[in-house]
A protein has these predicted regions:
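Extended C-terminal subregions enriched in glycine
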Residues: 346, 394, 428-429, 437-497
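Short, small/polar residue-rich loop motifs at catalytic or cofactor-binding pockets
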Residues: 228, 334-337, 398-400
Length: 529
């Protein structure tokens, strides 16, 4: 595997931020330099991303976070996903759930997550933390090429410009033009001053209920909460891998790793290693199809799934000479998302992913607030046999997942993630193997050629299982691609950096030094203090 890089790793001792947008990185660093904690800086980064990357995440979206408290060697999973409105049920839809409009949304969970993080880590006031986001919304920021491309790309698929008018955007925006969002600034100021209640009990909640014709109720907003739980944790080599519990598909990442642990990946030829990992992915995705849903509504036996006997049985299905094109024997689309990480001078760190699901989510803005809603309700199934069947108050299965890695002594070793719908767990699988087995540094890892196995070329679905196309960046040697084809994979070449991920990665040395890497496939970077 080539280890040449476009960028150098970033080394720091007193704090680090890595994100997909430079202004968000600057906001996080600003909060750290003012004495804020990793949690404070993460909230600031999150809020700025909602302002400057609204197509990927917003106050009307969701968040999942894995945190590490260095002093207590404590890891937590924050599940900031929203529930279906109590008016939402399968009989409200014919053949599919609406993709746009308020009926495509779940209760937003991001703002609630901010305040749970602040409870756990907060040192500065929310006025101080949200000040950078309020400034960019009130006084404007210069549109970069990614911002302009995201708007034009959305308009090519959906010519209706109403969502952009509601956000206050000029659809003829050019790179360098100033983007001002006065209504969003007002909403952020209300949240900074009045706290969580401003969103879930106050004027914002009332405006959502009124504009949605009662689809959402005040009860839906008032009853929402971010769940704070122990993460799922499994041993891989000499490390503990921490992932998101259901309804996140973080369990699939852990299953992939457990299957792969039975093989010496470091000594494998690259074609064999890719083949093995793709086959492990197929098995794990088949399990997801049968098991993944909201654990508050269905039973999910993860102890059984992760048991050594279950993993051994799944591992035995892998033929190292031939791709499995049939359904694995298991027990009974592109997405718009943003990932970032933050660590502080005390060794505390957060791995954070937030999203409105598809590009610009529901394409519907709560009137008078500047807040864009998610379209995460489309993550449900209308099949009554599915564990992910839609129901009032239920959370849909989520592609969103964040992860961290600790050593046997409990200290943080790695943290990372990426957006990308079903690509997420596949990319994260590769990142962890590259770090632990292949010993790549974070920047080498972020830039390394990647693959993705999808149910169809360019496609992504929560029903995805085992069939599909293996897409590989064309920096991989031709002999490797040919070997994969000979094993039976349907291989398609992506451009050199054409994989749909935007990775941010952190390594923490035993002496506490931070090393961060940022993906050249996106416009962000890493910065330290």
């Amino acid at each position: 595997m080539s280890q040449s890089t476009h960028r150098s790793p970033v080394y720091a001792r007193n704090g680090i931020v890595a994100a997909s947008q430079p202004l968000a990185v600057s906001a996080g660093i600003e909060i750290l330099t003012k004495g804020g904690s990793a949690g404070d800086a993460a909230i600031a980064t999150s809020a700025v991303l909602a302002v400057v990357e609204p197509g990927a995440s917003h106050l009307g979206g969701d968040a999942f976070v894995i945190s590490h408290n260095a002093a207590r060697k404590k890891n937590l999973a924050f599940n900031g996903s929203g529930e279906a409105a109590h008016s939402a049920s399968a009989d409200q839809f014919k053949n599919e759930i609406d993709h746009h409009g308020y009926k495509s949304a779940t209760v937003p969970g991001l703002v609630s997550t901010w305040f749970e993080i602040h409870k756990e880590f907060g040192l500065l006031s929310m006025d101080q933390i949200l000040a950078p986001a309020i400034d960019y919304a009130r006084n404007g920021f210069a549109a970069n090429s990614g911002f302009v491309k995201r708007i034009s790309g959305h308009l090519k698929m959906f010519p209706d410009t109403q969502v952009f008018k509601s956000l206050g955007f000029d659809t003829n925006l050019k790179v360098g033009d100033l983007v001002v969002q006065s209504e969003l600034a007002d909403s952020l100021e209300a949240i900074a001053q009045d706290g969580r209640d401003a969103f879930y009990l106050g004027e914002i909640a009332r405006k959502l209920v009124e504009a949605s014709d009662g689809w959402f109720s005040l009860r839906d907003l008032a009853e929402h909460r971010t769940r704070v739980l122990p993460p799922l944790s499994v041993k891989y080599r000499d490390y503990l891998i921490h992932g998101q519990p259901p309804p996140s598909q973080g369990m699939i990442l852990l299953e992939e790793l457990l299957i792969a642990e039975g093989f010496d990946l470091a000594k494998m030829q690259e074609a064999d290693r890719i083949h093995l990992m793709v086959e492990a992915k197929k098995i794990a995705f088949a399990d997801r199809y049968l098991l993944l849903g909201d654990p508050e509504h269905i039973d999910i036996n993860l102890e059984e799934l992760f048991a050594s006997s279950s993993i051994t049985a799944r591992r035995s299905q892998i033929n190292m000479d031939r791709a499995n094109l049939k359904e694995p024997s298991v027990s009974s689309e592109g997405s718009d998302t943003t990932y970032f990480l933050v660590a502080d001078r005390d060794g505390n760190a957060l791995s954070w992913i937030q999203s409105v699901f598809h590009g610009f989510g529901a394409s519907w803005v709560i009137p008078g607030t500047g807040i864009l809603l998610n379209n995460r309700l489309t993550g449900f199934s209308l099949d009554p046999k599915s564990p992910n069947f839609i129901a009032p108050g239920k959370r849909p299965a989520h592609t969103l997942n964040a992860w961290s890695v600790t050593r046997e002594d409990g200290s943080l070793a790695y943290m990372g993630g990426t957006p990308g719908a079903n690509i997420q767990v596949q990319s994260n699988f590769q990142l962890i193997v590259n770090a632990i087995d292949l010993k790549l540094n974070p920047q080498e890892n972020a830039e390394a050629p990647r693959w993705q196995h999808l149910n169809k070329a360019g496609g992504s679905s929560l029903d995805e299982k085992y069939e599909g196309v293996l897409q590989v960046e064309n920096r991989v040697e031709k002999e490797i691609l040919q070997s994969l084809k000979e094993k039976g994979h349907s291989v398609e070449e992506l451009s050199a950096y054409g994989h749909g991920s935007a990775v941010q990665l952190l390594e923490v040395l035993p002496n506490g030094t931070y090393i961060a890497g940022s993906d050249p496939r996106c416009e962000g970077h890493a910065a330290g203090i």
